């Protein structure tokens, strides 16, 4: 099957572990989920046939849950428990670890200088963003008023873009989240946590941008 003309966001939702494959190739399937696989591969100078072959292999596995057809209220409840609550746990812990690593290893050239600041910015932005979704947008959608929510949804999508840009800064600061040979246990644990956060946040944004918001605007 030819995947090259399909949007990244659609592929990430319909093929098991496609999101992990896109992450490996540093392809943006959440904020950039509307671009086709062919366009995304061309921008990264990647061989689209190789990626299509890998996707075909992944597509042989059954998908755990197809959120594209789930009720909107169920999607919202899942987003809050699986992503919002998880981000509220992840970020304070990562900020503590980054503070320690930047302090203890300040004299090392490989120290991720500024990481604490960027994680704190992400924490503040996401805390405000998730609260607005939970208090304003999600109740509107649950009440069947999603088609009238173009304004709030536009704001949320813009904030998703800002979060995506911060993730890129964090990846740059951490050498693409790769610990140096001299990294201590806390440093390595922190990078594992950052990788988990990036995966979670990209899946979270993808589910909202590519499923929840379009279906809500369509009047479901």
Swiss-Prot record:
Subunit structure: Homodimer.
One Gene Ontology term of the molecular function aspect: metal ion binding
Its biological purpose: Di-iron-containing protein involved in the repair of iron-sulfur clusters damaged by oxidative and nitrosative stress conditions.
Species assigned in the record: Shigella boydii serotype 4 (strain Sb227)
Disulphide linkage map: none
Keywords: Cytoplasm, Iron, Metal-binding, Stress response
Alphabetical list of InterPro entries matching this protein: FeS-repair_YftE, Hemerythrin-like, RIC_family
GO cellular component: cytoplasm
Coiled-coil positions: none
Protein name: Iron-sulfur cluster repair protein YtfE
NCBIfam families for the chain: FeS_repair_RIC (TIGR03652), PRK10992.1 (NF008221)
Family: Belongs to the RIC family. YtfE subfamily.
Record Pfam families: Hemerythrin, ScdA_N
Alphabetical list of CDD domains matching this protein: Hr-like (cd12108)
Localization annotation: Cytoplasm
Gene3D superfamilies xrefs: nmb1532 protein domain like (1.20.120.520)
Primary subcellular site in the record, as a coarse category: cytoplasm
GO biological process: protein repair; response to nitrosative stress; response to oxidative stress
């Amino acid at each position: 099957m030819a995947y090259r003309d399909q949007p990244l966001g659609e592929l990430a939702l319909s093929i098991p572990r496609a999101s992990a494959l896109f992450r490996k190739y540093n392809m943006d399937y959440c904020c950039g989920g509307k671009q086709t696989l062919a366009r995304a591969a061309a921008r990264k100078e990647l061989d689209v046939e190789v990626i299509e072959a890998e996707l075909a292999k992944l597509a042989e596995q059954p998908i755990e849950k197809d959120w594209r057809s789930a009720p909107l209220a169920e999607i919202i409840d899942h987003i809050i428990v699986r992503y919002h609550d998880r981000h509220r746990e992840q970020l304070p812990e990562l900020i503590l670890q980054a503070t320690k690593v930047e302090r203890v290893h300040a004299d090392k050239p490989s120290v991720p200088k500024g990481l604490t600041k960027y994680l704190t910015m992400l924490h503040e932005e996401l805390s405000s963003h998730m609260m607005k979704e939970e208090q304003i947008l999600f109740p509107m959608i649950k009440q069947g008023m999603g088609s009238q929510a173009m304004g709030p949804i536009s704001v949320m999508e813009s904030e998703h873009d800002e979060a995506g840009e911060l993730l890129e800064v964090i990846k740059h600061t951490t050498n693409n989240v790769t610990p140096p040979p001299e990294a201590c246990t806390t440093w390595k644990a922190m990078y594992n946590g950052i990788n988990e956060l990036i995966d979670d946040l990209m899946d979270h944004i993808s589910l909202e941008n590519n499923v929840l918001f379009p279906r809500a605007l369509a009047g479901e």
